[in-house]
């Protein structure tokens, strides 16, 4: 059983140099710290699960949920002591993506800096590849 998490937006990244890595997703130090903080309050969960859903004005949207187990088809990313599981349906859309956590005076959210995105909606919540 999964529990819903926080809001996430996506940004199309142009001219981004891909870093050689075996992981489909890399995490910034800010994202790692926030995930550790979130999981500290949820000891029954082992990590976060990233999925992709069909919704929004541009077609696709990422979802983030707490998870207690790794699904059979999930790809596991372990970085700096945190575990992020990527649902099979989301794996190709996330290749080369950097997951960040951004805070400003009015909001805080996870942001997916994704070089595969062709377009996003005005609010940044949905995208197409």
Swiss-Prot record:
This is Iron-sulfur cluster assembly 1 homolog, mitochondrial. Keywords: Iron, Iron-sulfur, Metal-binding, Mitochondrion, Transit peptide. One of its GO terms (biological process) is iron-sulfur cluster assembly. InterPro entries: Fe-S_cluster_asmbl/transfer, FeS_biogenesis, FeS_cluster_insertion, FeS_cluster_insertion_CS, HesB-like_dom_sf. GO terms for molecular function: 2 iron, 2 sulfur cluster binding; metal ion binding. It comes from the Eukaryota. GO terms for cellular component: cytoplasm; mitochondrial [4Fe-4S] assembly complex; mitochondrion. NCBIfam families: iron-sulfur cluster assembly accessory protein. Interacts with CRY2, but not with CRY1 (in vitro). It comes from Rattus norvegicus. Gene3D superfamilies: HesB-like domain. It is found in: Mitochondrion. Belongs to the HesB/IscA family. Fe cation binds at residues 57, 121, 123. Involved in the maturation of mitochondrial 4Fe-4S proteins functioning late in the iron-sulfur cluster assembly pathway. Probably involved in the binding of an intermediate of Fe/S cluster assembly. Residues 1-12 form a transit peptide. Pfam families: Fe-S_biosyn.
């Amino acid at each position: 059983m999964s529990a819903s998490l926080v809001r996430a937006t996506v940004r199309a990244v142009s001219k981004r140099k891909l870093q050689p890595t075996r992981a489909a997703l890399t995490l910034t130090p800010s994202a790692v710290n926030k995930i550790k903080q979130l999981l500290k309050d949820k000891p029954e969960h082992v990590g976060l699960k990233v999925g992709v859903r069909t919704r929004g004005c541009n077609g696709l949207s990422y979802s983030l949920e707490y998870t207690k187990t790794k699904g059979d088809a999930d790809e596991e990313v372990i970085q700096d002591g945190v575990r992020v599981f990527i649902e099979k349906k989301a794996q190709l859309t996330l290749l080369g993506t950097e997951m960040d956590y951004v805070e400003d005076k009015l909001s805080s959210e996870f942001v997916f800096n994704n070089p595969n995105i062709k377009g996003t909606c005005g609010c940044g919540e949905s995208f197409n590849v």
